[in-house]
Amino acid sequence: MDKSESTSAGRNRRRRPRRGSRSAPSSADANFRVLSQQLSRLNKTLAAGRPTINHPTFVGSERCKPGYTFSSITLKPPKIDRGSYYGKRLLLPDSVTEFDKKLVSRIQIRVNPLPKFDSTVWVTVRKVPASSDLSVAAISAMFADGASPVLVNQYAASGVQANNKLLYDLSAMRADIGDMRKYAVLVYSKDDALETDELVLHVDIEHQRIPTSGVLPV
């Protein structure tokens, strides 16, 4: 074998890949494929659950019933002394209340603690007599009778506890928008005084669509 043949043979040997060196996937490749599959499934889930005019997302957690949307009220409780109570009737905007016969299916309250929140509060929603002045004594009795679900919201290091929502189903009661003034959100400050800069309540009322609801709620 002359020198040129020897050089060519050496070059061919160098070009021959080692067995399995390029075919075996790395752990990074495997992780990337798993991540891609997860993202694909997530995109499909999000696409299926995106709100539409007929199916707006109810309080960012689930779809409204077909033919329903929701209106929102934001409540900021005043200072509540330790062991005392606060109550506020549900007063919807005039643009909604003029359709007072539209049915209401659910009320959901989201408790949003502000950065200074370090207390324990009990929150509920109740139908209260028109004659009630929502005094401390009256609200105390409503919390004690066990007639409505109560959400207990406590300080959490993350700022918001895992379960910060209370859902009140009115479907069986055939309640309508006009009835909402008969309902009130009630708050009990258990451990110490609740200051004005500690808590915000977001109340979402799911009701039949009304002519003014031509766009998705925010």
From Swiss-Prot:
* Subcellular localization: Virion
Q: Which GO terms describe its cellular component?
A: ribonucleoprotein complex; T=3 icosahedral viral capsid; viral nucleocapsid
Top-rank taxon of the source lineage equals Viruses
Q: Does the keyword Chloroplast apply?
A: no
According to the UniProt record, where is the region Disordered? Answer: 1-28
The UniProt keywords, alphabetically, are: Acetylation, Capsid protein, Ribonucleoprotein, RNA-binding, T=3 icosahedral capsid protein, Viral nucleoprotein, Virion
- Positions bearing N-acetylmethionine: 1
> Which InterPro entries does this chain map to?
Cucumovirus_coat, Cucumovirus_coat_Asu_sf
Compositionally biased, Basic residues: which spans? 11-21
Q: What family does this chain come from, according to its entry?
A: Belongs to the cucumovirus capsid protein family.
Q: What is this protein called?
A: Capsid protein
